[in-house]
Regions:
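Phosphate-binding core of ATP-grasp and ATP-grasp-like enzymes
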Residues: 1-23, 29-62, 66-74, 89-99, ...
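Short acidic-glycine loop/turn motifs at beta-strand connectors
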Residues: 55-58, 112, 151-152
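C-terminal structural cap/anchor segments
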Residues: 78-85, 91-92
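Short glycine-/aliphatic-rich beta-strand segments at the starts of folded cytosolic domains
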Residues: 102-112
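Hydrophobic structural segments
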Residues: 108-109, 147-150
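Short, conserved charged micro-motifs
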Residues: 116-121, 152
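Expand to "…catalyze enediolate/carbanion chemistry for C-C bond making/breaking, isomerization
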Residues: 123-124, 149
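Short helix/strand-capping connector loops at secondary-structure junctions
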Residues: 139-148
Length: 152
């Protein structure tokens, strides 16, 4: 189980994700326990994202269950020893599941629409990992890539 990832949305589109999430240890534990319970009750195999809202009483409300790898988890490619993508393939192919270990705290920014043009021209530091999805048609608010910044 990966640690909770904090997401910020803009116009109903994921704009930014980060670890560690700015949550209490109680919310952290409840989020992991609830996600695990959902997975067990569904007898689910593979990567699943459970998205929560936190109310003013610090209760968790399940907003979405995504039975797949999820955009918010793209930072697992660089911030963990094993990504959500590899773990998903391992699970569905019944390969050994590796223990998840965090390498670094991280932030991931989705690159939307024409923003991609500036990113394609940039030079990145060794802590920055740029992913260009190679989409030929640029549309406003379309996810064109992402940038993960490791916080070592």
């Amino acid at each position: 189980i990966y640690e909770p990832i904090e997401n910020i949305h803009q116009d109903q589109i994921l704009k930014y994700s980060k670890i560690p999430a700015d949550i209490t240890s109680n919310i952290y534990k409840n989020a992991q326990d609830t996600a695990k319970l959902i997975s067990e009750k569904l007898d689910y195999v593979g990567t699943m994202c459970v998205e929560f809202f936190i109310d003013q009483k610090e209760d968790l409300l399940v907003n979405e269950i995504a039975p797949r790898v999820h955009n918010s988890g793209h930072l697992t490619i660089n911030a963990f020893n094993i990504s959500q993508f590899e773990n998903h393939v391992r699970a569905v192919c019944e390969f050994k599941i590796e223990e998840v270990k965090k390498i670094a705290n991280a932030e991931m920014n989705n690159i939307l629409g024409k923003e991609i043009e500036n990113y394609r021209k940039r030079t990145f530091s060794s802590e920055e990992h740029f992913f260009d999805y190679g989409k030929k048609i640029i549309k406003d608010k379309r996810k064109m890539g992402h940038l993960t910044k490791l916080k070592k």
